[in-house]
Amino acid sequence: LKYLSPLEEQSKMILYHHVDTDKLQDVDYQYKPETEILKVAEIMDIWHMAFVEKFDYHMIERYIGTKFDKRACELLYQAVEQYDIFNKLTDGSYYNEFEESVEYVLLSDEEKEKYLRMLMYTTGLKKESMVADTIETIYVCKEIGRKMQLSEMDSAEIYYAALVHDIGTLAIPEDIIDAPRKLEDAEKNLIHTHVELMHKAIEGKFSQNIVDIAVAHHERFDGSGYPKGLKGSGMNTKQAILQTAETVVSMINDKPYRKAYNKEDIMEELNNGIVSGKYDGVVADTFLRYYDEIVEKAFQKAQVTLTTHQRLLRNYEQVYKNFTK
């Protein structure tokens, strides 16, 4: 949050919201009262779901002054009396209020990009290589687009689609993503749902062009892809660029179930795909003609971003260890 989102000033709220109040008495930082409210709200949500009909918000009283701040708890009591918050949570009223309020949130283009990048980086907390794959895919897309002389608008749409194309994998169990073996059909089908999950998450939040590019990243021009089995006539160059870039990056990198492909194998796969109609001929041929240049530039640029991410991840792990001793 501090380095990779528009929420730099609020980042300590997340850093400290699991730390007991009595351990933070000598720690002064902006948004400290809001952090205490967040802590109370989170535990109320957890208890409300866990205890169901046995839930009683007064349970928090035994922890006032130790785990939770007195003023934050007083605000909780006032909110319960004034707004009937727990009944609204139970009957779903707040979901409608939240959906309505989101419609009035106005963000600049810069803020939108930062939030998207933050969302993309969260995949790295689950599996670091997922962030690497996404960042490398972004830069391969950019280099292919440059060679094809795409407009600034088209390049931007591909960029945003590439940022979010794999966020659905956050919902896929790690033991399946990391499986060092051939997956069962049921497991493959589960992994395939990451596209639909991503689609649901971004539908209505981005322009339809961006959505269409992102949801087609596993489609193939011969109809052999998923989830819809689209064919060439139903797709466009922007979709083909993300498909090609994602395919190339996947082959270049090691996977739990196989070693990385070498250059000759990648070129053979793409050439065969052009002949069979699996890949868009113009896009794939552009990549092949400039293979070395595109890969070198894209991976150099990606490494700069990844170095920053890896440093932040190490810092996160150290902070986590300090607070869990």
Question: Residue spans of the language-model regions?
Answer:
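Histidine- and acidic-residue-rich, metal-dependent catalytic cores
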Residues: 1-325
